[in-house]
């Protein structure tokens, strides 16, 4: 979900049978009254053959343009491509820009950092493989439709105690050059946090923390009054 020019945009992957089985079109609604009422459903991307699964949609705003990034998958969580769409206000719809063979699983909206660069948290795999390694994409130009550079948060999906990361879905709190990146940890069911002091270029080892949390998605954010 994101706010753009006074409108809330909310998008999801619509599993018509069960999660990531069969067609998974990306659908969207809009609200012009702060979420009290919503528009009819719009379809942004779909493959009715079910050969390509879409998941998940995330948003970003750059140079006053609204973008949506979507993963293509060949099976559940096996990443085939990263797709980019831009919202055309004059046409009142999203239009496809490009698709690149980047096996990076999205999780959060685009973050703009204090150094002008953009950050996308997620997890990486081999092409058409399962992403079990936390990583970030960085846009050095600060533009969403430009090249993105991959930075590993850790070398692979192995933890020091011998357990393995399964779905290391990550989310960030950013303050100037400092980033706290929170990660799901399925096997131990103890959430992890990684720290960066240089805008996501290098990362600490994983720490455990005491926020009650299980093996499910986690999202962080900063409110308008500065609270995280």
What does each of the following model-derived ranges do?
Residues 2-52, 61-216, 222-228:
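Beta-rich carbohydrate-recognition and catalytic domains
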Residues 56-57:
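Charged, often glycine-rich, active-site loop that binds/positions anionic groups
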């Amino acid at each position: 979900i994101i706010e753009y020019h006074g409108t809330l945009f909310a998008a999801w992957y619509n599993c018509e049978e069960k999660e990531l089985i069969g067609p998974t079109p990306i659908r969207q609604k809009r609200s012009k009254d702060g979420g009290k009422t919503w528009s009819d459903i719009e379809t942004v991307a779909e493959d009715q053959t079910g050969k390509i699964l879409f998941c998940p949609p995330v948003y970003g705003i750059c140079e006053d343009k609204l973008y949506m990034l979507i993963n293509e998958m060949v099976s559940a969580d096996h990443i085939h491509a990263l797709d980019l769409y831009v919202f055309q206000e004059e046409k009142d719809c999203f239009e496809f820009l490009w698709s690149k063979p980047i096996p990076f699983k999205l999780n959060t909206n685009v973050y703009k950092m204090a150094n002008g660069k953009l950050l996308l948290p997620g997890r990486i795999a081999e092409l058409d493989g399962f992403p079990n390694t936390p990583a970030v994409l960085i846009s050095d130009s600060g533009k969403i439709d430009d090249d993105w550079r991959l930075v590993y948060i850790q070398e692979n999906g192995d933890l020091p105690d011998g357990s393995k990361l399964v779905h290391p879905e990550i989310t960030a709190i950013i303050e100037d050059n400092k980033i706290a990146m929170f990660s799901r940890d399925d096997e131990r069911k103890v959430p992890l946090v990684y720290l960066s002091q240089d805008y996501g270029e290098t990362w600490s080892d994983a720490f455990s923390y005491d926020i009650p949390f299980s093996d499910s998605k986690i999202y962080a954010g900063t409110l308008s009054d500065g609270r995280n």
